[in-house]
Amino acid sequence: VRETATVGTPTSRPARIGDVVDDNAGSRATGLAEVDRVLGGGLVPGSVTLVGGEPGIGKSTLVLQLLGAAAGSGVRSLYVSGEESAAQIRTRAERLAALDDHVWLVSETVLDHIRTHIAEVDPAVVIVDSVQTLHDPALGSAPGSVTQVRECANALVAVAKEHNVAVVLVGHVTKEG
């Protein structure tokens, strides 16, 4: 005999797909043609995109180029770095011609602090580099653990929807997957 638990009332109701109102104004072009092509037109407000790959392959450089290009169109963004100092990222941004007043930068790994920064800056795009460095102290496990990565990523999905912001998570491919 299998027991099930009820957890409150459903938060939504089924609807015919044609009756669903598109709250997102569609994708927002990044300014990088090839990235926009791969993403089907650009980043979608309220969504999360994962940029993954092996360490050293250029993920951080790519997302910084993306922010520089978006800033050229007046798009406010927030780059959250859990790996490099703000000075290191500024140096790379300078090299990539991505220095712009529309790009905000913070070195942070604590999930609640990142939420606060997103609310303060009110960006259209948030980059989190990398998801493996994030930490929610309430979970009690180490940063980079499967539990931390899963729960922090899920929390950022909720933040993306709540603030209607496009979130890009940078993730390293590891031997563990």
Task: Walk through the language-model features, giving the residues of each.
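Long, basic/Gly/Ser/Thr-rich N-terminal segments
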Residues: 1-3
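Conserved nucleotide-binding/hydrolysis micro-motifs of P-loop NTPases
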Residues: 55-57, 83-87, 95-98, 109-113, ...
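The Walker A/P-loop phosphate-binding site
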Residues: 5-96, 115, 119
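Flexible beta-alpha connector loops of hexameric P-loop NTPases
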Residues: 24-26, 52, 78, 100-108, ...
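Structural recognition of the conserved hydrophobic beta-strand(s) that form the central parallel beta-sheet
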Residues: 79-81, 104-106, 125-128, 165-172
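Conserved RecA-like P-loop NTPase ATPase core
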Residues: 35-38, 51, 89, 129, ...
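Proline-aspartate-enriched helix->loop->beta-strand connector
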Residues: 116-128
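Substrate-engagement module of ASCE P-loop NTPases
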Residues: 147-168, 172
